[in-house]
Amino acid sequence: MKFDYLIKWHSVAEEKLRNQARYILQQSQNRLIAEHFYDAVKSEIDKLYYTADVYRLRKKKEIPLLNGKYIVKFLVGAHTVYIIDFKSAKQQHYSTP
């Protein structure tokens, strides 16, 4: 089992995460809340560094984050986990940023 994957964010997924953090900042008017959200998502994704091998054989490569409020779609390569999309769990489909 491999435990040292690199984590790479696709630009679309990264932009969607930033947009959600901006939305949270706009709604809350509190920079700390928006930063905490952004850092919490990044921290959860960083766990794929050592857990990605578990997902390698699964057909659906998505994980819920922050108590299921958000979903991240990813691919597992030989040495890298590619974060390819990010969305709110309320959204039916992945969309463009």
What residues fall within each predicted segment?
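Juxtamembrane/interface motifs at transmembrane-helix termini
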Residues: 36, 54-56, 76-78
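Arg/Lys-rich, positively charged N-terminal/basic patches that mediate binding to nucleic acids
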Residues: 1-38
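Charged, low-complexity, helix/coiled-coil-prone segments
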Residues: 15-18, 53, 57-64, 92-97
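GIY-YIG nuclease signature motif recognition
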Residues: 13, 41, 74
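A short, surface-exposed loop/turn module that caps and links secondary-structure elements
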Residues: 39-67
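Catalytic cores of transferase enzymes with a strong primary signal for eukaryotic protein kinases
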Residues: 16-22, 29-32, 43, 47, ...
